Amino acid sequence: GGDYSQGTPYQDGYQKGWEILALAEMQVDFCTLGNHEFDVGDQAVENSWVNARKNRLRYGVYHKLPQLLVSNMFIKYNANGEPISYTSADIRPNDLSTNAFGAGAYAKTGAKNYAIRQVAGYRVGLFALEGEESYGYCKNSDLTRMDCAEVARVYARFLKEEKGCDLVIAISHCGMEEDRATARAQEGFLDVIQNAHDHLAYDQPIVENGVIM
């Protein structure tokens, strides 16, 4: 759910990809970015994934790296330095060209818009959201984001109707209040929001508009 970096002396090796290699050792399948991944700038995010991939075997990590998912983060400026205005038409799950970490400036992260995994006979679709509050902490970033509720509606419908998924999960770095607002705006296609950013533990799942969090 993001914030896999920061908080310990391990952060000194962030751009070397140490935290990502630790996720691989834990056999984490998917992850997304939180605000702390941007603490030393956008380029550091790409550097960490490039170096993790390059140094995996050197550091004795034999499990594959997690798949990075990014679904609502876009390049903020065009080649002329002018701000880019995005609309709902720019939310295109099958098109990596607008994804800043897919085919944009930091494509070497290897990020994808979404992923599909077969689990216990079920077809599970996943995508990822960066929240408004979380992204407000990313002071060094030249990226922008689109509204989580709007992106979630498009991706959830796409994964259910076009990709035939039985279950759709949003990996979120938004915080519970934003996640609840996202859940209330859904149309019955999103099943689960895997919540992060708050760093809180919940004894029981929270259900909003049929979405489990």
Residue ranges of each PLM-predicted region?
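Acidic, metal/ion-coordinating pockets
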Residues: 1-213
